[in-house]
Amino acid sequence: QPWIPFV
């Protein structure tokens, strides 16, 4: 799964 940064 693609990595989504927590912003």
From Swiss-Prot:
Its main location: secreted. It is found in: Secreted. It comes from the Eukaryota. One of its GO terms (biological process) is defense response. The keyword Lipoprotein does not apply. The modification Pyrrolidone carboxylic acid is found at residue 1. The keyword Transferase does not apply. Keywords: Amidation, Amphibian defense peptide, Pyrrolidone carboxylic acid, Secreted. One of its GO terms (cellular component) is extracellular region. Induces contraction of intestinal smooth muscle in isolated guinea pig ileum. This is Peroniin-1.2. It comes from Litoria peronii.
